[in-house]
């Protein structure tokens, strides 16, 4: 069957490891998709949102370098272009083709603020946790 769960590319490695009977490596940020594949109930529930980062990946570098992040829920998608302080906000239920950018809409200001907070949280939790840092022991 088909699932409409929100998933990320980082979920693939933990899924393959679980299928091979191996534990995820320390610091892996993905979540195994195995429950979705087994259809353990919540077939359409995996994540509340998905996160994406874009760092100047065009075939021709731009100035200033392009740096954008995105958070998407089932209902909304918010893209923040950090290099220009511009953004995009779409209501995916009302506008699945993403044609009407609501970034500047006063009627969507509360949704925008909530998604910006959600984006900031995802950015904070997505920082590379490795290598594990040790506190040096001081002799004294």
Where are these regions (language model features)?
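Short small-residue beta-strand/loop micro-motif enriched in glycine and branched aliphatics
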Residues: 1, 97-101
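A short, structured beta-strand-centered segment in the mid-to-C-terminal lobe
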Residues: 1-9
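Short alpha-helix boundary/capping segments
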Residues: 4, 103-107
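C-terminal cap/loop subdomain of S1 sulfatases and analogous C-terminal strand-loop tails that border
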Residues: 10-13, 18-88, 92, 97, ...
